[in-house]
């Protein structure tokens, strides 16, 4: 019995030596909490890293010639904060965000001509915006020369000073401004929805699809509202043509948005189909444009407005060409990931086209203020 007990004791000791040492009990207090927080931070850091094109989920694969610096399925807060970091959407976001700020500034300036409270607000709060709008106008030169009288407000401008920049005469008061403000509002909606899409579509598949549809809607709205100032003011004395042309382009815009609500058309392979829908909407303006030229053949400002509208059309068509061909990144994949790729060029040309159309709208309004309509 004694020998058996000794053998059992030795065997137990042998197994104890082979057994792994027990893990030390977690320290009481904040040590374990700190470790857990550090682990969570590390996980979040890994989640929010920039990834390559091949690491993206299929729904985010839009341009295979941009190889790196993608945000993929980031938390919404991190996506928002990426506004201030460098990735392949940074310039896309800021071009249209700054464009929105510019058009917002122009809208506030023009509202100030009719509402003294807005004019006072410009004097106290909006000096930087008005200066940006003024500087952009002067840098563009002749293309925006027609808008110069709108930009003379000083930082302390009052309602009287605003009115002096563009006197609201009796004729002007009779010429409604709502089509002009419809254009400005549509431009702001397009630019802001585009910036939001590029900023937040990296969050999830569901939000990506929603924001892409919002972006397409913004483009369609921009095209539709661009028709309002020229058609309304050129055909102000012939209301039936106002109704015909504005109804037609609005219906075309609604039909285009409805077609683009299909998730299938959001896929990258339908890029050309989407672009052609928008181009068709824009080119539908050839008919009212030809009619307008015929009606105003002897109007001395005809060539000025045609130059502005030609600049707008050239900007939009060139932007569409970059969007479709994906040049220059197609030539050197990876070289233009962060700066200089086609979508960034497209964004810059959209801003240029919108500003050219803004200048044309100013000329249309001034011409209508001076001419009025002949007595029946």
Curated annotation (Swiss-Prot):
Gene Ontology terms for molecular function: signaling receptor activity
Keywords for the protein's UniProt record, in alphabetical order: Membrane, Stress response, Transmembrane, Transmembrane helix
Pfam family, one: HlyIII
Region (Disordered): 20-46
Domain of life: Eukaryota
Transmembrane segments: 91-111, 180-200, 217-237, 241-261, 275-295, 304-324, 345-365
Major localisation: membrane
Extracellular side: 112-179, 238-240, 296-303, 366-376
One biological process term in Gene Ontology: response to hormone
GO cellular component term, pick one: membrane
Cytoplasmic side: 1-90, 201-216, 262-274, 325-344
Membrane topology: Multi-pass membrane protein
Stored InterPro entries: AdipoR/HlyIII-related
Family named by the database record: Belongs to the ADIPOR family.
Described purpose of this protein according to its UniProt entry: May play a role in abiotic stress response.
Name assigned to this protein: Heptahelical transmembrane protein ADIPOR1
Organism per entry: Oryza sativa subsp. japonica
Gene name per UniProt: ADIPOR1
């Amino acid at each position: 019995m004694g020998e058996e007990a000794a053998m059992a004791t030795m065997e137990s000791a042998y197994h104890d030596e082979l057994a792994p040492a027990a893990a030390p009990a977690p320290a009481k207090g904040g040590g374990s909490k700190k470790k857990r927080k550090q682990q969570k931070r590390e996980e979040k850091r890994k989640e929010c890293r920039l990834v390559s094109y091949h690491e993206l989920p299929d729904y985010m694969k839009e341009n295979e010639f941009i190889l790196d610096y993608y945000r993929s399925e980031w938390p919404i807060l991190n996506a928002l904060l990426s506004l201030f970091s460098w990735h392949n959407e940074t310039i896309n976001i800021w071009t249209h965000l700054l464009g929105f700020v510019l058009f917002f500034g122009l809208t506030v300036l023009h509202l100030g001509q009719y509402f003294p409270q807005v004019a006072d607000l410009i004097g106290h709060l909006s000096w930087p915006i008005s200066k940006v709008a003024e500087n952009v106008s002067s840098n563009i030169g002749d293309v925006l020369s027609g808008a110069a009288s709108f930009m003379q407000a000083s930082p302390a401008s009052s309602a009287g000073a605003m009115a002096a920049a563009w006197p609201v005469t009796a004729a002007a008061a009779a010429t409604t401004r709502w089509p002009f403000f419809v254009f400005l509002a549509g431009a702001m909606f397009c630019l802001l929805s585009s910036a939001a899409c590029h900023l937040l579509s990296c969050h999830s598949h569901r939000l990506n699809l929603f924001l892409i549809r919002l972006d397409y809607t913004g483009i369609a709205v921009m095209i539709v509202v661009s028709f309002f100032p020229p058609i309304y003011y050129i055909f102000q004395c012939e209301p039936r043509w106002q109704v015909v042309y504005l109804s037609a382009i609005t219906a075309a815009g609604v039909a285009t948005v409805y077609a683009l609500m299909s998730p299938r058309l959001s896929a990258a392979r339908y890029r050309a189909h989407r672009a052609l829908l928008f181009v068709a909407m824009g080119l539908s303006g050839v008919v009212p444009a030809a009619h307008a030229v015929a009606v105003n053949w002897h109007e001395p400002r005809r060539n000025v407005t045609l130059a502005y509208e030609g600049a707008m059309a050239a900007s939009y068509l060139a932007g569409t060409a970059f969007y479709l061909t994906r040049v220059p990144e197609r030539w050197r994949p990876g070289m233009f990931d962060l700066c200089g790729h086609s979508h960034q060029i497209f964004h810059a040309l959209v801003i240029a086209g919108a500003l050219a159309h803004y200048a044309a709208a100013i000329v249309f309004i001034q011409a209508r203020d001076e001419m009025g309509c002949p007595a029946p």
